[in-house]
UniProtKB/Swiss-Prot annotation:
Gene: rsmA
Keyword check for Transferase: yes
SMART domains xref list: rADc
Entry protein name: Ribosomal RNA small subunit methyltransferase A
Alphabetical keyword list: Cytoplasm, Methyltransferase, RNA-binding, rRNA processing, S-adenosyl-L-methionine, Transferase
Domain of life per record: Bacteria
A GO term for molecular function: 16S rRNA (adenine(1518)-N(6)/adenine(1519)-N(6))-dimethyltransferase activity
EC category: transferase
Compartments (UniProt record): Cytoplasm
Family annotation (PROSITE patterns): RRNA_A_DIMETH (PS01131), SAM_RNA_A_N6_MT (PS51689)
Family: Belongs to the class I-like SAM-binding methyltransferase superfamily. rRNA adenine N(6)-methyltransferase family. RsmA subfamily.
């Protein structure tokens, strides 16, 4: 299938026609906003740097606007769609492609490891490329990142504010537990901004394409990974409070003397705030506080 004879569905007239014919109604609970801009879709595909030696997982394909572009560049695309009313639409729009697999399921509830074995060549690198539902962006991302599946790269659209938080540096307003949780595993950067005007229906905020590349090993080495995340999350519960106040709230007031002693030994100020600590400093903090683990 060449560029000249591809029946593009990524324009507002074709999209509206497809939705009208199938009597489709947008469902707010699924956060549905369909892209209708050829240039943006091309840019997303280019950012993903696909080839016929790469498989793709897509979440929330909608009517398949982005899916078309992915299928032309990747070996295979496996798309997960939770909205049953979109299944007949996708079966129609993706009919010309033999490298497309549609899974009618919630990405958070499927056995993803079993599903990816259904790729014709499951040993190829797998990238996640998707316009993620805004209402559940973070749970989906963390579910995929923390899974045992070695996704090599993510190129995903989300609210600009969330993308900024994930890619944020220490001592910035956007920096927080989400920044560290993702950057521990992935190198994250905002690739480009997507205006709200290129969707139907238009969302209330602008979006961003976030590119995340999996690190060969976590960014920092810690003695206890679960404890590292618990300590880190505890430090951000109340952003305006000091590290000591947050840690006391997490581990109990009676633990204050021991926390003070452990922080002093690690040369970490109890009056600093969580957003001022780098991921390396959080690793040092977590290891220092390990004696508090019950």
């Amino acid at each position: 299938m060449t560029e000249n004879n591809i029946d593009r569905i990524s324009n507002i007239i074709r999209t509206q026609d497809i939705l009208r014919r199938h009597d489709f109604n947008f469902k707010k609970k699924f956060g549905q906003n369909f892209l209708t801009d050829h240039n943006i879709l091309t840019k997303i595909t280019q950012t993903a740097e696909l080839s016929k030696e790469v498989n793709v997982i897509e979440i929330g394909p909608g009517i398949g606007s982005l899916t078309q572009y992915l299928l032309e560049e990747a070996a295979e695309v496996m798309a997960f769609e939770i909205d049953k009313s979109l299944i007949p639409i996708l079966e129609e729009t993706m009919a010309p492609y033999d490298n497309f697999t549609l899974v009618s399921a919630d990405i958070l509830k499927v056995d993803l490891l079993s599903e990816i074995q259904k790729f014709k060549n499951p040993n190829l690198p797998i990238k996640v490329v998707a316009n993620l539902p805004y209402y559940i962006t973070t749970p989906i991302l963390m579910h995929l990142i923390e899974s045992k599946i070695p996704f090599s790269e993510f190129v995903v659209m989300m609210q600009k504010e969330v993308a900024d938080r994930i890619a944020a540096s220490p001592k910035t307003k956007a920096y927080g537990s989400l920044s560290i949780a993702v950057q521990y595993y992935m190198e994250a950067s905002v690739a480009f901004i997507v205006p709200r005007t290129v969707f139907i229906p238009a969302p209330n905020v602008d979006s961003a394409i976030l590119k995340m590349v999996r690190r060969e090993a976590p960014l920092v080495e810690v003695e206890d990974e679960e404890w590292f995340f618990k300590t880190m999350h505890s430090s951000f519960v109340h952003r305006r409070k000091t590290l000591m106040n947050n840690l006391q709230a997490a581990f109990g007031k009676e633990s204050k003397p021991e926390i003070e002693k452990l922080l002093a030994q690690a040369e970490i100020s109890p009056t600093i705030r969580g957003e001022a600590l780098s991921i390396e400093e959080f690793a040092k903090l977590a290891d220092a506080l390990l004696p508090l683990k019950k």
